[in-house]
Amino acid sequence: ISQSQGSMTSGVDGKSLDGMSEKRISALIESIRSFSYQPNPARRVYIEKKNSTKKRPLGIPSTEDKLVQEVVKMILESIYEPNFSDCSHGFRPKRSCHSALQQIQNQFTGITWFVEGDIHACFDSFGHHVLVNILRERIEDENFLALIWKMLKAGYMEQWAYNCTFSGTPQGSGVSPILANIYLSKLDDFAENLKKSFNKGKSKENLEYQRAASKLYYIRRKNRANWENWNEQQRKEALRLQKDAINYMHSLPSKRANNKEYKSLVYCRYADDFLIGVIGSFEDASEI
């Protein structure tokens, strides 16, 4: 926790992590054991959004709440992380927007239509009852679920006024990202089932793409064989030709687009943004 950005920022109680002691931790553990633990409301602040004049609300938890949230996150990750979809890239260990782009580069080939989705106010709109029922499918410990329920209902303070939270998981909470992924895993499951029912037939290679790939292969082989013997100008010209060949190959679909016997769907999600690639008709994409 101490290594994360904003870890030393205090919540509504004015306490920060640098004042943490063994006595405070022991008292926190005892309050959880006795079921008397009650999270403080988060201190709401607003931060700038990139490429926008709007500001994003951010909840800053109290120090004790940060510790509890981190432990809850670790438990949830141990339960859910092994079963999350490979198409999910947001807020996950060893995954990022870079892994999402890598999946798109590798799997979204020959796509004829794209369906793009952005879930508006995602973190603020999760149904609490729906989320807990999803958790209950895998977790039998009602005391643990009750602890998460308290976190969801803790509310927030803004301009010294208390506000209830009726839905969503507050941005800034350490447990919000994993809860969001658990909630949205239902979308991932839906996309996977849709893919199984939609996909049919076998793809046919695009001959023009194959010719471009072969040309690129020979250019690269020629460059490697002659590189040491070329002068600077020859090397620049060789790299230019190789780059042109790469760009041309990437501009072509690897599969034939007019194969009506073949349909395919691919899906990728990063947090609340998702992308569906469709090889099929416009009607297929519209229905999806």
Where do the protein language model's features map onto the residues?
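Non-catalytic terminal/accessory segments
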Residues: I1-I288
